[in-house]
């Protein structure tokens, strides 16, 4: 990339709001931000089946609000007070219950027919132990017959050049982005560089990528069983070429 910029690196630091503080919350709903795919709310409303839904990483309510408008009672868990404040400021946001905390371990009152984690949010838990704990926590909150849905990418390690660990995912005049992988630990960090008036600002956020079969084992350890796995929200088949999956595990009734 032939662009000269003045130094302006800012690394996201863990604090009260984790890596998703006011700086990210302020632009999370910008028109250029990743949008919710069509069909998401339809699928979630169907799975809720008239019961309560629990959203992990509820954020600014981009999914919870339209789901609540469909008549589904939604409760959310989120570590970021800055994100929750944005939710509260939206029409209808004050009617959605939110518990502030780490969704791997935070408990809430009551049980749910549906719990869900979308847009790669399971990867915000940066250790395998935390991801396993999340499944156990959700299983304890589900009613018998209730479902746990996760939407997450399939790790695209085929794009890694031999001997390298960096994969670019966006390049434009305004911003650039790349992921750095550690295939030994499944740790990755997502780097975002924004160019404003010739100045570059750098943001880095850690994640842990996870394989479908690994998620199935986590579910099994929590007493859940796989019900469906699709290649996307259109319920297309999941294949070796799929770049994401929507997986649903069910809590047995017996």
Residue ranges and their predicted role:
Residues 149-218:
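SAM-dependent methyltransferase
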Residues 116-118:
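A conserved beta-strand element that flanks and buttresses the S-adenosyl-L-methionine
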Residues 212-254:
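C-terminal lobe and adjacent flexible extensions of AdoMet/dcAdoMet transferase-like proteins
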Residues 107-114:
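A short acidic, Gly/Pro-enriched loop at the edge of an enzyme's catalytic core
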Residues 132-144:
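A short glycine-rich, Lys/Arg-flanked "PGG" loop and its adjoining helix->strand segment in the class I
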Residues 3-49, 51-59:
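Conserved class I S-adenosyl-L-methionine
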Residues 60-105:
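Class I SAM-dependent methyltransferase SAM/SAH-binding core
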